[in-house]
Swiss-Prot record:
InterPro entries: Ribosome_maturation_RimP, RimP_C, RimP_N, RimP_N_sf
Keywords in alphabetical order: Cytoplasm, Ribosome biogenesis
Domain of life the protein comes from: Bacteria
Coiled-coil stretches noted in the UniProt entry, renumbered to this chain: none
Subcellular localization, as worded in the UniProt entry: Cytoplasm
Keyword Cytoplasm: yes
Function statement: Required for maturation of 30S ribosomal subunits.
Alphabetical GO biological process terms: ribosomal small subunit biogenesis
Protein species of origin: Treponema pallidum (strain Nichols)
Similarity section: Belongs to the RimP family.
The protein, known as: Ribosome maturation factor RimP
Any one cellular-component term (Gene Ontology): cytoplasm
Length: 156
């Protein structure tokens, strides 16, 4: 698993706006389509995955939607943006840089050997992560991992 922080200008610009609402932007997929004959203008389509330690509710998604649409319109130079905002759920972690966002959450990691471990994410940096399983911390270098996935606890 590689560690490569997302440094694209559009991602950073949107992440800053999302942080102002107390959330983290985990992933942003963004595209601008060609000019449509019907509407005679280009349109943007985006999907944002956000995280908040207190949970991502419908209200949080709506607030992020309202604040992100104008930013995406400006970045894409389009008047119309179709934006979908959602929580990470049981997200497969695609990049080791995402681990720092999910500190304190339960994750399942798979090793190159085919074995796996479930634990609470206690620490993450550029080279390794630390899971706490049964009160015992285990440090795991990213090079030993093939896959990782969130296992969110059910919140009442």
């Amino acid at each position: 698993m590689n560690f490569s922080p997302n440094t694209l200008g559009s991602f950073e610009s949107c992440a800053e706006v999302v942080r102002s609402l107390g959330c983290a932007l985990v992933d942003l997929q963004w595209s601008v389509s060609a000019v449509s004959r019907r509407v005679q203008q280009a349109q943007g389509r985006a999907r944002a995955v956000i995280y908040s330690a207190g949970g991502v509710t419908l209200d949080v998604c709506a607030r992020v939607h309202r604040i992100l649409v104008p930013r995406l319109q400006a970045l894409g130079g389009v008047r119309t943006v179709f934006l979908e905002v959602g929580s990470p759920g049981e997200r497969v972690i695609r990049n080791a840089a995402e681990f720092s966002i999910f500190l304190g959450e339960t994750v399942k990691v798979w090793f190159c050997t085919g074995q796996f471990q479930v634990g609470t994410l206690a620490f993450a940096d550029e080279t390794c992560l630390t899971l706490t399983a049964g009160g015992v911390p285990v440090t795991i270098p990213y090079v030993q991992l093939t896959k990782a996935q969130l296992h969110p606890a059910v919140r009442a």
